[in-house]
Structure formats: C-alpha cells, structure tokens
C-alpha cells in the first residue's frame, strides 16, 4: 500500500487483543461516517506504517493513530480517536488536561494487563462484510 492510498485517519490496534477488538467495534458504531480506518499492528500494512513512523514492529502494547501524517500513541492516540466520535464521547478530549505522563501510566497499566483481564485470540479478527471496507489489508 503506497502512502497515497493511506486514508487520513488510521487506527492501528493489536489484532489478537479482545479489549482492542472491542474498542474497534465501539469506535465503528460511533463513527458512522467512516472517518477512521483500521489495520492491525500485526498486518502487513500495520507493520509498514510502524516502520515508516519509526516505531517498533514487535511491540503491540499501544494503539497507534495516524492523522494527516502525524503519529500518536498510547493515551494521546485514544483521545485523538474519541475526538472524532459522535455523541458525548468527544468530551474525552478533556483528558488532555491530565498530564501526559499520568495518562500514559494508566494506559500502560491497562495495556500490560489486557490479555489477563480480557483474553486474546489466536489470530487477528476478521471484519464482517459490512465493515470490511474500513479495514486496510
């Protein structure tokens, strides 16, 4: 996939993480205009985007949100995504008032325990036909 084919907003997520997959489903329901596209961190496109962004390709402990060429990780990525959702979810931008080290500490604690608390799949989720167009290969 060339850089011209990459949408303006892409969320990279851990494709085997149940919590992450649930978050993607949550986002899709609240982004009916399809402003955000998705790819797993483990996918060919995800790996390519991680490399281009100078991020490690073997650690899957953070959402990565790429918006208009800017790369965001951890709590900042999550808050940036919420900014595009319909309804009261946009109010999550208020968390930008919390210092980034504190936000990222909480994010990292959840990320570290996500498999223990929510489980994981053996392989990446396959999107249903109705949402497949939102997922990059």
Curated annotation (Swiss-Prot):
GO terms for molecular function: protein-disulfide reductase activity. Pfam families: DCC1-like. InterPro entries: DCC1-like, DCC_oxidoreductase. It comes from the Bacteria. Belongs to the DCC thiol-disulfide oxidoreductase family. This is Uncharacterized protein YuxK. The gene is yuxK.
């Amino acid at each position: 996939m060339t850089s011209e084919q990459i949408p303006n907003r892409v969320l990279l997520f851990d494709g085997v993480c149940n919590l992450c997959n649930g978050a993607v489903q949550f986002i899709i329901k609240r982004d009916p205009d399809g402003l955000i596209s998705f790819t797993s961190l483990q996918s060919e496109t995800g790996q390519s985007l991680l490399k281009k962004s100078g991020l490690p390709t073997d650690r899957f402990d953070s959402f990565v949100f790429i918006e208009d060429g800017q790369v965001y990780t951890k709590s900042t990525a999550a808050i940036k995504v919420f900014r595009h959702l319909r309804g009261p979810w946009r109010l999550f931008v208020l968390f930008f008032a919390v210092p980034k080290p504190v936000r990222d500490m909480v994010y990292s604690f959840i990320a570290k325990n996500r498999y223990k608390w929510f489980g994981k799949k053996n392989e990446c989720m396959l999107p249903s036909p109705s949402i497949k167009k939102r997922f990059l290969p």
